[in-house]
Design a protein with these regions (language model features):
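Extended, helix-rich scaffolding/adaptor regions
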Residues: 2-139, 151-155
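Solenoid-repeat scaffolds in large eukaryotic assemblies
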Residues: 28-32, 228, 247
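Positions within ordered alpha-helical repeat solenoids
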Residues: 38-41, 60-67, 87, 91, ...
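Hydrophobic core segments within long, regular secondary-structure runs in both alpha-
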Residues: 55-59, 209-216, 251-255
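Alpha-helical solenoid scaffolds in large eukaryotic transport, assembly, and signaling factors
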Residues: 119-222, 234, 238-246, 279
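Residue-level detector of extended alpha-helical repeat arrays and alpha-solenoid scaffolds
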Residues: 192, 228-229
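Cullin-RING E3 adaptor/co-adaptor recruitment helices
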Residues: 226-227, 303
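Long alpha-helical HEAT/HEAT-like repeat alpha-solenoid scaffolds in very large eukaryotic proteins
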Residues: 238, 244-302
């Protein structure tokens, strides 16, 4: 057995990535589960309740099948077990990166607990109401109190952003709570934009189908155009960052959108903007190297 450290954590990530690829290629779940257990043992990873639960459910399902029991929901159960293992492997990868990857390690917040959405909502709603109440304050106290309110709000949003950024796989319930907060008309639009950006960046750090669906929901339901565009960029980039073939609910959510020509045109425009951004630095270098010197030298240039 080998303990994970700064010298071998990338090998571990390559191993788990290979297992996820095997799941995406529809290789037998039992085989991938056995390999997962072996890799966890090889690297002295502690036992995990979720992995044990997946293994127990798979063995029970297999046992009933071998006994000849008919179960119309077996295929659906099998697919959900595959999804659970894929997401668990993604979570394990993130945990290892947070421990050993120098870049990711700098992003981990001091408060590593899961975001308390109710507490965040109360803090942001209180900011809006307190800001409105400033109109009743004496003029000489307004500036000082406004500064205090914005500092408190900055601390709240900074903590929330970092907690979302480094979070693992979300449950549907947690994602719905976040989405409801982002779409709430009570909080500031800038806060909603920041939270959407945090979800997007979290999805880029560690692919999560639930976060993709959250961003899709915000895109569909947001009334503010800036928030709508932020969500569009978020789910497009997040969707490109992971292998979501095992999650047909994402494909089903996209079907009605892709049937809309206006939406397809919007996607094409976004792709063009990305291409232009990618080539902007090269274009600048070309202008500075080839175009500007000729303009400077040609003093008789006629316009």
């Amino acid at each position: 057995m080998t303990r994970l450290d700064d010298t071998n954590w990338k090998d571990f990530i390559r191993s788990t990535s290979s297992l996820k690829k095997q799941l995406s290629e529809r290789q037998p779940l039992g085989s991938v589960l056995s390999k997962t257990s072996a890799i966890m043992a090889d690297y002295s990873r502690p036992s995990d309740d979720e992995l044990e639960s997946i293994g127990d459910s798979y063995r029970l399902m297999s046992e009933y099948m071998l006994r000849g029991f008919q179960d119309n929901s077996r295929a659906d159960l099998y697919g959900k077990l595959v999804q659970r293992l894929y997401r668990k492997l993604t979570d394990v990868e993130l945990q290892v990166r947070k421990q050993f990857d120098p870049f990711v390690r700098t992003l981990v917040p001091r408060d590593a607990t899961r975001l308390d959405v109710d507490s965040l909502r109360n803090g942001l709603e209180l900011f809006v109401s307190d800001l409105a109440m400033l109109t009743l304050e004496p003029e000489q106290k307004v500036a000082e109190k406004r500064k205090m309110l914005y500092e408190r709000r900055h601390n709240i949003m900074s903590n929330a952003f970092n907690q979302i950024l480094c979070s693992g796989q979300w449950s549907n319930e947690h994602a719905n709570d976040i989405a409801n907060l982002i779409l709430s008309p009570i909080i500031e639009t800038t806060d909603a934009l920041s939270l959407s950006a945090a979800v997007m960046m979290s999805s880029l750090l560690s692919p999560d189908p639930v976060k993709v669906l959250l961003l899709l929901r915000i895109y569909k339901e947001a009334t503010d155009e800036k928030l709508k565009q932020r969500a569009l960029i978020g789910w497009v980039f997040a969707l490109d960052n992971g292998d979501f073939n095992l999650f047909p609910n994402i494909r089903e959510s996209l079907k009605p959108l892709m049937a809309d020509k206006g939406f397809r045109d919007e996607l094409v425009e976004l792709q063009m903007q990305v291409v232009f951004c990618m080539s902007a630095e090269q274009d600048t270098e070309t202008i500075e190297r080839d175009v500007m010197p000729n303009i400077i030298k040609n003093q008789n240039l006629e316009v």
